[in-house]
From Swiss-Prot:
Signal peptide: none annotated. It is found in: Cell inner membrane. The chain crosses the membrane at residues 76-96, 105-125. Belongs to the RseC family. It is a multi-pass membrane protein. InterPro entries: RseC, SigmaE_reg_RseC_MucC. It comes from the Bacteria. It comes from Haemophilus influenzae (strain ATCC 51907 / DSM 11121 / KW20 / Rd). Keywords: Cell inner membrane, Cell membrane, Membrane, Transmembrane, Transmembrane helix. It holds the Pfam family RseC_MucC. This is Uncharacterized protein HI_0850.
Amino acid sequence: MLRESAVVISYENGIAKVKCQSQSACGQCAAKNSCGTSSLSELNGKRGEHIFNVETLMPLREGQIVEIGLEEKSMLLSALLMYVVPLLTLLIVTMLSDYISDNEILRAILIFGLTALSFILVKSYSRKLGQQTEFQPVLLRVLS
């Protein structure tokens, strides 16, 4: 199970709204002061904040730090959907477009259009998956 600490923003009727910050391994090692990659990553500004609703029977207070978890299977399937499906669509459509038309502009439009469509379909499917309980984070423990 993937674990992450989060801060409780609000709690109402068994639903805690928690906020966690996305972490990056870059900038955490001993060589971060002399590393160009770490310097470049600082130019991006703040890391993203993510807000989740977590069901819990334990009453929580605003500001408490909790640990939430997500099954690895959920994360792997999400990554597979987001990265592999559009990439495979791009590669397959590129190969098949050779047989469909000799006009390169038409082929480029077909390739980009179907790849964009695959991103849209993945996004809508991932929203449906996000509603399922195995894709929802769970409260593991209260840290403070």
